[in-house]
Regions:
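Conserved lysine of the Walker
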Residues: 106
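P-loop NTP-binding catalytic core
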Residues: 2-92
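Switch/coupling sub-region of P-loop NTPases
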Residues: 93-99, 112-186
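Walker A (P-loop) phosphate-binding loop of P-loop NTPases
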Residues: 103
């Protein structure tokens, strides 16, 4: 059934609809297309750069905290003592870095530990695709959510701007190049 439904024609129409919604071109000259809704993140890579053919990834990014303390221990994310240590690190304003392979749960960990940030601490999130959703998962807390945009407002710009807003916390969704330098200097 799925092979009959997901035809080349369907994939082309789906891609064009996404491109139209975000007002972007998708072709050999513009081979990557990204879009998001309140709960989904869509990435499409053109067949001119993906040798296996057009690639589509649809990821759920709900504005909820899915991980609980009980689940973290029961599903062997970490031992209870380690979890308590990490929660206390957040409560005591320690710097933390979450790294790992794509899809491993870095954003879910950030969302989980963010609930332990003290109520009055100003938090600034800096993301290219809004996935942390701090304001939604931590209602009533002081938060500024920034979105970076290639060529207009990059991570380095966002970090510089956020420092003028007197944050207690800066959360970056990605740190790959010069933004690491700016973050460490802040």
């Amino acid at each position: 059934y799925i092979k009959e439904f997901i035809t080349d024609n369907f994939i082309e129409q789906f891609t064009q609809r996404i491109a139209n919604v975000v007002s972007r071109q998708f072709n050999k000259q513009n081979p990557q297309l990204e879009a998001e809704t309140s709960e989904l993140r869509v990435t499409i890579v053109h067949e001119s750069v993906a040798r296996s053919g057009r690639t589509i990834s649809i990821r759920k990014t709900p504005p909820i905290i899915r991980l609980t303390e009980e689940k973290a221990v029961q599903e062997n994310f970490c031992e209870e003592k380690i979890l308590a240590l990490l929660i206390n690190c957040v409560k005591n304003r320690c710097n933390m870095i979450f790294c790992g392979m794509p899809g491993i749960g870095k954003t879910e960990c950030i969302k989980f530990f963010s609930q332990y940030i003290p109520q009055n601490d100003r938090v600034i999130t800096i993301e290219d695709t809004m996935e942390i959703r701090y304001s939604a998962t931590n209602p009533g807390k002081d938060c500024v959510e920034m979105r970076v945009q290639a060529g207009r407002f990059d991570y380095a710009d966002a970090i510089k701007s956020s420092l003028r807003l007197n944050p207690r916390w800066i959360m970056l969704s990605e740190a790959r190049s010069k933004e690491v330098k700016y973050l460490l200097e802040s």
